[in-house]
From Swiss-Prot:
Protein name: Pantothenate synthetase
EC number: 6.3.2.1
Family: Belongs to the pantothenate synthetase family.
Protein's pathway: Cofactor biosynthesis; (R)-pantothenate biosynthesis; (R)-pantothenate from (R)-pantoate and beta-alanine: step 1/1
Other known facts: The reaction proceeds by a bi uni uni bi ping pong mechanism.
Enzyme active site: H37
Keywords, in A-Z order: ATP-binding, Cytoplasm, Ligase, Nucleotide-binding, Pantothenate biosynthesis
Record's function text: Catalyzes the condensation of pantoate with beta-alanine in an ATP-dependent reaction via a pantoyl-adenylate intermediate.
Positions contributing to ATP binding: 30-37, 147-150, 176, 184-187
Enzyme class: ligase
UniProt main location, coarse: cytoplasm
Organism: Pelotomaculum thermopropionicum (strain DSM 13744 / JCM 10971 / SI)
SUPFAM superfamilies: Nucleotidylyl transferase (SSF52374)
MF annotations from Gene Ontology: ATP binding; pantoate-beta-alanine ligase activity
């Protein structure tokens, strides 16, 4: 497995693979890999001849008081895990490689980004869309793989790729969870044992709402309130948002008559966690 630190290196690797007629699968990450990331890589491996991942903690998607500086980083560990699932190359650029002096171009997707994480993290999706556009242009994959845990991000990237006529397919992979239901996240490492226990309220509240939906409840406000009440009962939880929108349009709903996204963001201590569930059949 090759580790490339420069754009020219990873482009040369991809060019060589293409010259042999190999398809390219791409998984962009910020590193500190977990089983959710590895599942994306396995899906890429199943579908594509060559798998490239990026490991880049992107500064433009973090706000001024967020966790950019303390976001966990361990390239040696990540390379070992990626190698075990058959990744062919890692692109691990520096900030200077991606954003050289004088950089001033950004990508902004409208409408889909003005709610949920986009509302509580201003500028976040501008940073995400910019770095993903750059990575797509550098790697030029046939397929790119994103996790459903970041449901809004996956929808935004799909919209961006379609709107800008990017020549690739964006594939969303179901959320991978711990045995007790907690959605896999690199930020879970921040949680102490008591916070880790408290964090289960996210997945359990989604499951409770899912049960009510399957039992026939279609009133979006009642389902939302059910989740809010359950999370508020957890002393360590501080709610950022709990919302229900049509899926994939992300339009407000009163009654759920088709697929709907129940999405939430909750702070456990200082750690912001997100999770979601799709209500209704896709």
């Amino acid at each position: 497995m090759l580790v490339c630190n420069t754009i020219s290196e990873i482009r040369a690797f991809v060019r060589e693979a293409r010259s042999k007629g190999r398809s390219i699968g791409f998984v962009p990450t910020m590193g500190y890999l977990h089983e959710g990331h590895l599942e994306l890589m396995r899906r890429a491996k199943e579908r594509c001849d060559t798998v490239v991942i990026s490991i880049f903690v992107n500064p433009t998607q973090f706000g001024p008081n967020e966790d950019y500086d303390r976001y966990p980083r361990d390239l040696e560990r990540d390379a070992r895990l990626a190698g075990q699932v058959g990744v062919d190359a890692i692109f691990n650029p520096s900030v200077e490689e991606m954003y050289p002096a004088g950089y001033c171009t950004y990508v902004d997707v409208e409408r889909l980004t003005g709610k949920l994480c986009g509302l509580s993290r201003p500028g976040h999706f501008r940073g995400v869309c910019t770095v993903v556009t750059k990575l797509f242009n550098i790697v030029k994959p046939d397929y790119a793989f994103f996790g459903q845990k970041d449901a809004q991000q996956a929808l935004v990237i799909k919209r961006m790729a379609a709107d800008l006529n990017m020549d690739l397919e964006v594939i969303t992979v179901p959320t991978v969870r711990e045995a007790d239901g907690l959605a896999m996240s690199s930020r879970n490492v921040y949680l102490d044992p008591e916070q880790r226990r408290a964090a289960l309220v996210l997945s359990r509240s989604l499951e409770k709402a899912g049960e009510a939906f399957r039992a026939g409840e279609r009133d979006a406000s009642k389902l939302r309130q059910m989740v809010l009440d359950m999370i508020k009962a957890e002393p360590l939880a501080n709610i950022d948002y709990v919302e229900i929108y049509s899926y994939p349009e992300l339009e407000p709903l009163d009654q759920i008559n088709g697929p709907a996204l129940l999405a939430l963001a909750v702070k456990i201590g200082q750690t912001r966690l997100i999770d979601n569930a799709i209500l209704g059949q896709l």
